[in-house]
């Protein structure tokens, strides 16, 4: 017995319903379901908009740690920064070395 399967889309960009109760701005990080997405447009609360599910982004981090290319990174939703400390939201992996003084880091988001 086989089931009908329908191809829908590549998946790099998905439609997302903004159920956060707040407007989301273009390029905001959206933590959801254990991962992060990046808003592809302004998305008003309750509306549907596009989110990026992969790509390399420069995101904020703090100046108390270093990252090495390939390190697994997480999103600290409370502070709005990348971290190596495991959180509920896996962000991806570092695509460049981050020295301690840096306040941003490059991350490849993908799933």
For the regions a protein language model found, what residue spans apply to each?
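Surface-exposed, low-hydrophobicity beta-strand/loop segments enriched in small/polar/acidic residues
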Residues: 1-111
């Amino acid at each position: 017995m086989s089931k009908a399967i329908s191809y829908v889309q590549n998946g790099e960009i998905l439609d997302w319903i903004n159920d956060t109760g707040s407007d989301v701005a273009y390029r905001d990080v959206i933590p959801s379901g254990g991962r992060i997405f990046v808003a592809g447009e302004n998305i008003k609360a309750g509306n549907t908009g596009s989110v990026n599910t992969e790509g390399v982004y420069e995101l904020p981090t703090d100046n108390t740690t270093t990252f090495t290319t390939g390190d697994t990174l997480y999103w600290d939703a409370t502070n709005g920064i990348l971290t190596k400390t495991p959180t509920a939201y896996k962000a991806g992996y570092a695509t460049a070395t981050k020295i301690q003084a840096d306040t941003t880091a490059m991350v490849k988001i993908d799933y």
